[in-house]
Amino acid sequence: MPVFVVSYDLTRPGQQYEQLLNTLEHELQGRRVLFSQWAVRSKGDARALLAHLRPSLIDASDRLLVMDRDSLDWAGINLVSRLEKIEP
């Protein structure tokens, strides 16, 4: 099963992380890497995991990035910069 790196920003002050954290930690048995970054094993691809996590976000301004650790396949919502524009 691939390992995904999940990074998020809940952008409004005072937002509660409980639903997202519960999904990441308990349902997906992920491990926190940084304050807002987790490592998660999941079947499927980055888009499938993003679709699974999306209901845990609080509002439309939240940001979420899911990236396969090995293949670098990724999916995101409201990213600050577009990954396609980053030169190797």
Locate predicted features:
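Extended, hydrophobic alpha-helical segments
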Residues: 1-33, 37-40, 44
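Short, intrinsically disordered low-complexity segments
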Residues: 26-73
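Short, structured coil/loop segments at alpha-helix boundaries
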Residues: 20-25, 59, 76-80
